[in-house]
């Protein structure tokens, strides 16, 4: 095991100064143990903002047959609340707009088990990016933490790592420039977190792939935002999982020529081979819009340059901003 920290606990405190640093500590820890003990292959399990890219950075540096397993999302409560609801209600209570008994009720029901924040926040964004990158098994990014699907994901990953060892398939065979472009495309189509930008730049650097801010702008000009997911949308990752996860979305993007189907994945097959038998979303679902009727026709992520950030900065367009 290595360390991890929760931004959910440290947000708004001095503790956030340690958050991004923890990513490097995690990567260094994985590299140190595996390098010292001579492991032939690695399965890394993560499930929060910084430990997921930390795992991938460590696996990239080691470049031994590897798989990432996402720990999974927290399921929303019976009243459709989650961790973020608690934060919002705490703010309402602080302003005198909510009774203490109502706040306590929300606190008691909203986080009923393990897992990462249930919307398209950083954890689910990075889980989706890693699946699109090819470093986790198909379906891993959307499964609930306590589900039978997640247990099967773990078992299947154990079988898959043997195949990777037999074929000597390493992260450098999977994490190519084209694979990172796939990950960026999927993140944009899902309306993912701005943190994906800084994490994917670091992940690419670790594996020796040249990736920069302009790649996000270039890809964003042709990639629509199609997912109605929290925080700017209405739905949770568990709802998307019930409708097929991100695989049908990736199939659509592949069919539209926005993904590189030739990229190798931890299944031992290419992305196109993994997606060949994936069925489209049901017509009556309203979580993922059609390609021709997106929420936004171009990326919600914006790369900015100016006197405050001469080397670049990232911003996110949310809600109905910039949709005209």
Identify the residue ranges that each predicted region occupies.
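Long, structured ligand/cofactor-binding scaffold of large enzymes
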Residues: 1-70
């Amino acid at each position: 095991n290595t360390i991890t920290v929760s931004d959910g606990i440290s947000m708004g405190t001095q503790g956030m100064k340690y958050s991004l640093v923890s990513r490097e500590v995690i990567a260094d820890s994985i590299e140190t143990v595996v390098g010292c003990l001579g492991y032939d292959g690695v399965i890394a399990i993560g499930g929060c903002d910084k430990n997921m890219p930390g795992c991938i950075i460590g696996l990239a540096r080691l470049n031994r047959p590897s798989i990432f397993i996402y720990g999974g999302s927290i399921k929303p409560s019976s009243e459709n609340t989650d961790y973020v609801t608690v934060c919002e209600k705490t703010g309402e209570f602080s302003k005198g707009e909510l009774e203490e008994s109502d706040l306590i009720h929300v606190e008691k029901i909203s986080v009923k088990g393990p897992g990462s924040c249930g919307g398209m926040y950083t954890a689910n964004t990075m889980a989706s990016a890693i699946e699109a990158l090819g470093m986790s098994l198909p379906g891993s990014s959307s499964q609930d933490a306590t589900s039978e699907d997640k247990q099967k994901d773990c078992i299947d990953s154990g079988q898959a790592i043997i195949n990777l060892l037999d074929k000597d398939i390493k992260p450098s065979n999977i994490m190519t420039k084209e694979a990172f472009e796939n990950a960026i495309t999927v993140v944009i189509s899902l309306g993912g977190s701005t943190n994906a930008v800084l994490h994917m730049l670091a992940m690419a650097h670790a594996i020796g792939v040249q990736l920069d801010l302009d790649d996000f702008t270039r890809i964003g000009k042709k990639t629509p935002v199609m997912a109605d997911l929290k925080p700017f949308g209405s739905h949770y990752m568990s709802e998307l999982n019930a409708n097929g996860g991100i695989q049908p979305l990736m199939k659509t993007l592949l069919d539209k020529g926005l993904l590189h189907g030739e990229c190798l994945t931890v299944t031992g097959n290419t992305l196109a081979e993994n997606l060949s038998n994936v069925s489209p979303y049901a017509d009556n679902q309203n979580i993922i819009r059609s390609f021709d009727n997106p929420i936004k026709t171009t990326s919600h992520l914006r790369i900015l340059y100016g006197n405050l950030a001469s080397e670049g900065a990232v911003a996110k367009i949310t809600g109905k901003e910039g949709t005209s």
